[in-house]
Structure formats: C-alpha cells, structure tokens
C-alpha cells in the first residue's frame, strides 16, 4: 500500500492507496500550527485503522513538510511535482492547473511548455485571504459563498493583500453596501489577483483543473474563474487531496508508520532561535508598571445620579462601534464598545434608545460622530457634528496630557500617529500598505494558534526568551513563527515576540522613524491594541520613555468626539441637540440599494441609504452631482483643465494614413508634442479611450508582473483598445530622457515611463501582425531628434517622408508642447489668484503627468475641491524657483518638478502640497522622503496619498480632512498667540 502525507500551511491531508491506485482512505484536517503533534496523531491513526503494523510506501509533501520529512528519514517530494504526478495519473488531458491553498496559490501549465507560477511574498488571493474576508463579514467561508450566489453587482476590491482588501471592504460595509455584493466582489478580486499576479501574461486556456480548498468549497469562485477565462473548468473528485495523492504515487520507500511517529517524537529542535530580552525582569516590575498605567483614568460618575445636559460621542470605526456619554465637566457617565457586525446603524440605534429609555427626560446637548462611518451615522440620526477621527483622538489625548507631542493610536487594522508642535498637529502618519503593526495582526496569529487574543497576549508577559521575529508582513511572519516552533520556541516566547514585532512594525515600517527620539518624549498611546500589556511594555522599552495609556484607550475617538461636542455647543450657547427623538429612533428604518451613477464619465458605484423619514444618504460618489443634481464646479481645479486640454487633441484627416497613440504614462504630457508631429506629417492621430476599469480588465491577462505600478498596468488595456481600431500603426517610443527644464542634475524619465513599450511589445499578442513603433527616440536634443527620426526611425515604417518634412513637423511639435505647458502655467496662476481672492486654501496635488488620468487618481482632485480648496499641479509652479541643492541625486524630470513645487510651497502661507504616489513605484521610495524633508524644513505639513487600483476613497478622505483640520488648528493657535501678544 502507498501512503501520501501533504502538510500544508494550514491543513494536513493524508491518503492511502492500494496497488491499483484506488483510494482506500483519506483525511483533511486543520493543524492550527501544531504540525508535529498532528502528523504523529495521523500516522498512528492510519497504522491502527488501515495498516495494522504492516509496512507501507510513504512520502511527504507540502509547504510545511520538508523539515519533518528530513527529521525522520522519509522521502520528501516537492508539492508542485506531486500535483503534476497526480494530475497526469488521474486527469491526463489537463492543460492547466489552478490551485489555491491556505497561504499559497499556483498555476501549473502542463502543455506548450511546462511551467509553474507561484505567489511569492503575498498571500492575497489564497484561502487565508478568503477566511480573513469572511471573518470581516461575520460569516463562515460557506456562508460567504452562499451569500455571493445572491449578488446583484460587484465592487472593485483589491486582493493583493488582506489589508488593502479591508480598506476596500470596510468602507463598503460602513456605507451600507449589500453583504451579498461584497462577498461576490471578494471572489472576483481573488480571480483578478490570480490571473494578473500569477499568469503574468501567459494565456490560461484549454482544459482547466481547479484544485485546493477554496476552489473545492466555493462554487462562486469557480464560476468567477470560468467567466474571467471564458472556459468551463473542472473541479475533480478528491480535489483537496491531489498533493497527497501525488506523494503517495511517488513513494518508493517503505516504513512502519508508528516507527515514523516515534522518530518524530524523538525529534528535538537542534537549532537555536534569535531572542529578545524579556519584557519584565520580575513580577514586581510588572506590578509597578500595571499600577502606573491604571492611574491614568477619566473620572466616572453614575449616570443614574446625573441631572443636566449630556454630550454623546460616537466612533463608528473600521471593525467596532464606540459610544461615550459625558457631562459638562468631561466626566464619563456611560460607555459602550462592541463589534460593528458589518452594519453599525442598528447597534447605535439600540444604544441611543437604551440611553433614552433608562434616563427619561434626559437633556442631550450635543451628539458628535467620528470614524470611518462618521458621515453615515451623522446623516442617519441627524447628529450635530462630524469630526475627522485624527482630531477626535488628539482632543482626547490633550485631556490626559495637555503638552503631548506624540500620539500613536493602534486599532484593529489601522494605525494613526501624529506629531504635535506648538499645540497643533504637525505631521500625520497612517498605515496605507500594511497592517502588520495592528491589532488584527495579533488576533490572526492568536486564532491560528488556537488561542483567544487576550489569553494569548497575557502569555507573553513573563516569557524568558521572546522570539526575535523582526518587523515583517503577516505572511512572512507566519513562516517565521512556524520556524520558531520547529526550533523549540514556547508559545509564551512566540506571543512576546509578536508583541515586540507589532511595535517595531509601527515605528520602523509605518512611521519609518530612524530613531525613537525623533518622535517625541511626551507620548499618549491609545487604541484597543494598547490594552495588550505586552505591546504596551514593548513600546515603552523600544521608545525608552514612560508613556500614558489612558484607561479608556479603546474609547479615545468617542471620548474626543464628546469633548468636541461639549466645546462647540458651549461656544454656540446650544443646550439642545438636533438628534432624533426617542419616538423617531423607534420608527427608524434603513434601506440600502446599490446603483451606478450615470451623471458623468466616472460611473461611480453609489450606495444609497434611504431612511424612514424619506431622507437619503449617498456614498461612493466622487463629486456632488448625485447629491445636488448639479455638475461639479471645476473652475479651481487644474487637473480638470488638463483633462480638457488633452481631450481637445482630435484626429485631423491626413494623406498618409492613421497613427494610434495610447493615452497612458508619458503621453499625458507629450500627447501635444506627438499629435502635432504626426499631424504635420499628414497622419490622423487617434488616441486610445480614456482609462476605465473595463479598459484595465481588458488588458489584465497580458500584465507580466503584479509589482508594476497601476499606471503601467493600465497601458496594456490601452494597447488592446488601439489594436482593435483600424490603424496603420501604433506609436509608443522608448524615451530615456525627458525635456530638460534646468531644475535637476539630469532629466531622465523613470525606467517604467522610459522603457515600458518594450514590455508591451513582448507581452501583448494583439500586437502581432501590427505595425508597432517603439524605437528609442530622444526629444531632449531637437537637432538629433530630427536626424534620428528622418534617417533611422521613419524609413523603417513609411516611405517618402523627407528630412525637411520631419524638420517642419519637429518645429510644430516643440512649439505645440511649449504652448501646452504655457497654458498650464497660465491657468495655474489664474486659479491661484482666484483662490486667494475667495480666501480658499491652495493644494498642490503633486505627482506625475499621468496622475491626471481619472482612473489613476480616482477623483482625488474633485474630492479636494469638495472640501473647499483649489487644486493646482506641480508643473504649474515648478518654474517659480531656481535649481537648489537636494539630499538625493536629482536626476528625474518629473521628480525635479516635485521638489521645486515643494520648495515653492514653503514660501506661500496659503499653499500646501499633497503627494500622489503610485503603489509599487521604486523611485518614490526616495522622492517621498526628500519631499517630506523639503516641506518640513519650511514648516509645512507633508501628506502622501498612495493610490493604485483601489477605488474606495474612505481612507484618502480621512487623510485630507486631517490635513485641513491640522491647518485650521495651526491657524487658530497662531491667532490665539497673536491675540495674547497684542494684549501683553
């Protein structure tokens, strides 16, 4: 008989085959990271039930199986090879295998060149990701599949990583989107991730086989793959067991299974692991620490004994709802903290009704909302004030430490840190890319190891040798934890190591501090994660300073909101809130529908909440048209003006034919140049359509790497669109250099902008048989440009074009480009002047020319103008400063403008810069730090917005509102100081 054991990242699968390869026995069980014990139990069980002490051929496979196989002398077979062996034996006609496991994803091409594609550093789109999303929706994976079957539409969700997906899913939940639609969207995201991230341009066709847990258990996931690939794939019998089946077929060495189990028993970790010093030297040190933190508390007063006005603060967070009631002295009368269960409104209504019922005649003076669901809650219950969460947390922190200079708030999946200077927020950090420093990070590990998170955290307090896990992402940390277990680390030392790692991630990955000292010495920590005393202690040790952790650390947003309401109603001499009465709350109803807006080209996916009294709250809109019925006023928006300019370049009929230009990357600046050049030569210039989600998905199958920035990925869709048009040629040259504006040490294009045509030529099958002009060209030297185009480039593709014609076309191109850039600068000046006349703030929304693409910027420019500010671009003001020294090599044209714009901002009181960064941009790893340095040296706030295919602007809105609130606070502090000085 043959036995195959597949030890995966989350499960163990085992099969027993007879001599004819008939399956006699199989099992599929989760191991909860207790790999050794589970393997021993299985081996002994199979021996007792199937083999009765007889020898059997045995081999081990799976991502977690190699160490065990080595330790007991059993042959190990690599899982991809194992899968191939089983597929060839049981489903020989298969062309391609798609296998999704707990933390790994694979595509195995078996025909036209055997090849395997596997996920590397990210577990997005795997079983663990689907489990995470199901947990977020408060469902089992099976329930999520059933819900998805009832979907009416889908949303755009990132599946690259659980954190990014949460940043898409959570706002949808908070805005009231249907759970069924979200569930279907998650499966669609997994499909997109697998196709774009793994296939990387290789077509998936022929007979497709689906393997692994997610594809076995989810009918909707299989259907989504079928729809995306245009095939009907097969999920075979025993699809969960193919790696184990392959291991059994490969086995050629016999063992008594109980002997193998005993050998594992004797296996003791010989490796030693790197460790950190213990969190506490002894019990006494812990007790002193505990007592110190318990002393930082807000006075609590019995609600029943209170008479007089009250102020309510509601924090509708990413995963929880917090409510605090205070009196006129800021004392707490009542608190409530509970999970939001995917829909915060019924829970908040229940709490408000409870307060009304238990305290009849209560005088509510103000109700203030904050958090992710702030607007929804405020509109639903007619609350008085909405407060951006950063300001709510700052307001609460000042209660405990009026001269606080650094606040860190670590919640379930988000992290907020702010530096305070002169009584106002001077810098804000939010985690955009990773939740490894957050509470859900610890919770995920506690659950994986089979513990409640509170018990798991407490285990680490007195660990003698905490494991040094470094600061890494959740997926990498998983393998580190498993390795530590193999090396003999106790659960206590792993728990302590994870708590230390949370702190290191927060400080060195999110905040990117070079040293703890630069952050501040008067620190308030808040957020539910700091109730974990191991994390709190690790933070103090890493910072080298004692911090204040309030007794209401998890309620600080709600408490700050209540204090804000108290202050505002006192200023306005308001004694009665406009919130719903008890009767209105009892009659409260919420209906949610999802619609696609047809008001403009954005086609926003709107979530419309309708309440019992007929009021509506619309979310998901990037402009005010769905709410007001009027088109957005773009008169103070230079992004909108640039879009209009580019749209004005229409094809002019030409005698020589037609040229197609993809409206992507560098063409967002150079379209006027090339339009004029080709038009003058007698070609009709056609551009690809404006970017859209559909255009991106159309080109997705040819994207060769998921690490490319989103604007580069979009270019595949543009090429596909052009290939379907009747054109004589498609033109997309490689441009090493850009125009020299004299601002930097050199004037390169970034490698992606410069050479991406090479990638397209090698990966887009639709270009086969097409005339694709992607020669290397230089426009930075006009004379050389004319010579090269006339002698080397054009003759290869078109006959009969003279050098004189090329010279005239080049002159027209340079003139058109200069006129285009001059228009942008003139319009920028007009917007600045008009904004100053109206007393508006001016935001330099700085990035690259292609960030003007609405599909890339997701309407962030319009979001800023909705907040009452004017928007200009970096290239409209970069000519206002002379070249100046920078800390980095200043060699990229686009970035030279960025630095110059930042420098100019520091000289203008009413101007601030927001930097757009495309996720995955290598050059921006340098530019962001340099831009921050320039702005901070000039006393300005630095705000960075990371953007990619994610379209939900919830986190972006919080960031922008935080910036505006911080600027307002600064102005207030400055006015107060000036008034005090005048009085003195």
Regions found by a protein language model. Give the residues of each.
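Short glycine-rich, Thr/Ser-proximal phosphate-binding strand/loop in the N-terminal lobe
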Residues: 4-45, 115-116, 120, 314-354, ...
